[in-house]
Swiss-Prot record:
It is found in: Cytoplasm. Its main location: cytoplasm. InterPro entries: Anticodon_Met, Met-tRNA_synth, Met-tRNA_synth_2, Methionyl/Leucyl_tRNA_Synth, MetRS_core, Rossmann-like_a/b/a_fold, tRNAsynth_Ia_anticodon-bd. Is required not only for elongation of protein synthesis but also for the initiation of all mRNA translation through initiator tRNA(fMet) aminoacylation. Pfam families: Anticodon_3, tRNA-synt_1g. GO terms for molecular function: ATP binding; methionine-tRNA ligase activity. The lineage of its organism: Bacteria, Pseudomonadati, Pseudomonadota, Alphaproteobacteria, Rickettsiales. CDD domains: Anticodon_Ia_Met (cd07957), MetRS_core (cd00814). This is Methionine--tRNA ligase. The gene is metG.
Length: 509
């Protein structure tokens, strides 16, 4: 069985200021990458920045700065976002890097050699903001792109990619691979778009210079989307089969926003088919966030700065909220009151309360040690409904992640914490201390073991907080994978726990 797992975010456009959408895509991808590592996979997780194109050239000229210097500066804001959000990417690709430029030139040549690129003349509507061409039929009544971007009529020599040739092959591929585009609503949109007819795609420009030159024809710059999409293979070392390209391609999961699904689910697979490269297994399109019910836009001044949120609430709390609040793939609303409610009612009241009550009681009443009980007693504890829920949750979560049902995994974890809180109230170890000290030790062990399950499962979402929980429980750093969630790796009788500290603080409205 192939144990590798390759996941990518889209590469972020350097002209943008990092916002909640970038944070959401990155955190979701990071949760999946961490989850797969915890499952025992060898993971390659890629993110990066898209640094070519007319918009970048114009922004650099406006600032009277060289485009390379401009992108060197602006790409740093995205590196900073990754660090601040605790994103565990294995690589960060920039499209201005030599390794990328070389791979794109080879990719272009392959398409040319295979007869998929030809010279012609482009005339039509182009939106600089979207770096995209639009049909007359796609424009609004005000002659704007569907995204609201201004369009201009351009007429210039161009190389074309024979996209129309791949229409039937794409439809056959979608049919044979129902999981290629997720969620199903987006899959249906893409199929409908392709069925409506594909036109050949202009893949070079001559009206600006900031980009990768077409091999052997430096009057032309390669269309920014062909350049950008190739990052997913250039970062691996394409075309060298002895590099990570041979090891990790095709990608298992490519996470994108729904606004760029067409590029990833139509153009990208067509380019790959034409270059005789295997296609990724799944393109997952997520939704957009609104802010307090309003569409987020610069003009409304209601963009959400993820760095400021982290500074106020903590990185793990923000990560948790982003993954918990909406179904991955659907649109969602950011409401500050909901963020505070989630932190207080779920993290603090349920998980934090369970952790604090249990570890504080053990620390004071059992000399800061895991209860010294027999293996028979531990075996019996594993027959309790509480531990059965814990074991089932761990198994279910693997299946949920296969379907990228991320928020349902958090449902399971919170439900387990709720069940454990009911258990501690009903068993009342503080009373058992006087009436049945032996039973008290068994109850405390069951609670500590349940907390171990919760913490191990929470690591992908809240790596720092879950790590603190596991440290408190005295869990060996080598025994924190999903395979360790079993009786065989249960907490060692009479082992030390650390002095309790608050891991999930409350926040005032």
């Amino acid at each position: 069985m192939n144990n590798t797992y390759y996941i990518t975010t889209p590469i972020y456009y350097v002209n943008d200021v990092p916002h909640i959408g970038h944070a959401y895509t990155s955190v979701a991808s990071d949760v999946i990458a961490r989850f797969m590592r915890l499952s025992g996979h060898e993971v390659m997780f890629l993110t990066g920045t898209d640094e070519h194109g007319q918009k970048v050239e114009k922004a650099a000229i406006d600032k009277n700065i060289d485009p390379q210097k401009f992108t060197d500066q602006t790409s740093q804001s995205f590196r900073h976002l990754m660090t601040a959000m605790h994103i565990s990417n294995d690589d960060f690709i920039r499209t201005t890097e030599e390794r990328h430029k070389k791979a794109v030139a080879i990719f272009w040549q392959k398409l040319l050699d295979n007869g998929s690129i030809y010279e012609g003349f482009y005339e039509g509507w182009y939106a600089v903001r979207d770096e995209a061409f639009y049909d007359e039929s796609e424009l609004t009544a005000d002659k704007l792109a569907p995204t609201g971007a201004a369009v201009e009529w351009v007429k210039e020599p161009s190389y074309f990619f024979n996209l129309s040739k791949w229409q039937d092959k794409l439809l056959e591929f979608y049919e044979a691979n129902p999981d290629f585009i997720r969620p199903i609503s987006r899959r249906n949109e893409v199929i409908s778009f392709v069925k409506s007819g594909l036109k050949d795609l202009s893949v070079s420009r001559t009206t600006f210079n900031w980009g990768i030159k077409v091999p052997n024809d430096n009057k032309h710059v390669i269309y920014v989307w062909l350049d950008a999409l190739a990052n997913y293979i250039s970062a691996l070392g394409y075309p060298d089969q002895n590099s990570n390209y041979g090891k990790f391609w095709p990608a298992n999961l490519q996470v994108v926003g729904k606004d760029i699904l067409r590029f990833h689910a139509v153009y990208w697979p067509a380019f790959l088919m034409a270059a005789e490269i295997p296609l990724p297994k799944t393109i997952m399109a997520h939704g957009w966030w609104t802010n307090e019910g309003q569409k987020i836009s610069k003009s409304l001044g209601n963009t959400i700065d993820p760095i400021k949120l982290i500074e106020e609430f903590g990185v793990d709390q923000v990560r948790y909220f982003l993954m918990r609040e909406i179904t991955f793939g659907a649109d969602g609303n950011f409401a500050r009151s909901n963020l505070i409610t989630r932190i207080n009612s779920e993290l603090s009241n349920k998980i934090g309360n369970l952790l604090q009550r249990t570890t504080s009681f053990v620390y004071k009443n059992n000399d800061g040690k895991v209860p010294a009980i027999t293996q028979d007693a531990i075996n019996k504890i594993y027959e309790l409904p509480l531990l059965k829920t814990a074991i089932n949750s761990a198994k279910q979560n693997i299946l949920l992640m296969e379907k990228t049902e991320i928020n349902k995994i958090l449902d399971n974890i919170i439900n387990l914490a709720e069940e454990a809180n009911i258990y501690i109230d009903s068993e009342a170890p503080w009373n058992l201390k006087k009436t049945d000290p032996e039973k008290m030790l068994e109850v405390l062990y069951a609670l500590l073991e349940t907390l171990r399950y919760i913490a191990v499962m929470l690591q992908a979402f809240m790596p720092s907080s879950a790590g603190k929980m596991l440290d408190q429980l005295g869990v060996n750093t080598e025994e924190r994978l999903f395979k360790h969630l079993s009786l065989e790796f249960a907490l060692t009788s009479a082992s030390d726990i650390l002095e309790p500290v608050i891991v999930f603080p409350r926040f005032e409205e």
